[in-house]
A protein has these predicted regions:
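Glycine-rich phosphate-binding loop of ATP-dependent small-molecule kinases
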Residues: 1-150
Length: 150
């Protein structure tokens, strides 16, 4: 079973995905985690990702789509994926549809996590203390939230 969790940054997609991974024995596909991994590698792509994320922008779809393609082509993960924050754009949705068709898969359920801006800010402030994520400063989060809502 393949699932999609969508919602603004800080809505709890990652938290819910982790719970579902344990319950369903699926694999979490977290674009945020994948992008942070690329940043850690300090590659040219990682530097571009860091620049975009630091400025509250979403990372270019071509970069994200390639990372997703690598996961969907893994036969061990077929029909066992929980997408956390992907797709975020029409381009990403079209890419996902194409890749699902190519790999003979489908999305079984889509969940939208609807959370207020105030709640998101509170959660991010807590997450910043606990997880110490580089993309969790208040100004960046507000920019990402506003970009998401456009």
């Amino acid at each position: 079973m393949n699932l999609i969790l969508i919602g603004p940054p800080g809505a709890g997609k990652g938290t819910q995905a982790k719970y579902l991974v344990k319950k369903l024995k699926n694999f979490q596909v977290s674009t945020g985690d994948m992008l942070r991994d690329e940043i850690q590698k300090n590659s040219e792509i990682g530097k571009k990702i860091l620049d975009d994320m630091s400025n509250g922008k979403f990372v270019d779809d071509t970069i994200v789509n390639k990372l997703i393609e690598n996961i969907l082509l893994d036969p061990n993960k077929k029909d066992r994926l929980i997408f956390d924050g992907y797709p975020r754009s029409l381009s990403q949705a079209k890419n996902l549809d194409h890749l699902l068709t190519k790999t003979d898969q489908k999305i079984d359920f889509i969940f939208f996590l609807n959370v207020s801006k105030e709640t998101i800010i509170k959660r991010i402030e807590q997450r910043k203390i606990i997880e110490k994520r580089s993309d969790d400063d208040l100004e960046t989060i507000i920019k990402r939230y506003e970009t998401y809502m456009e």
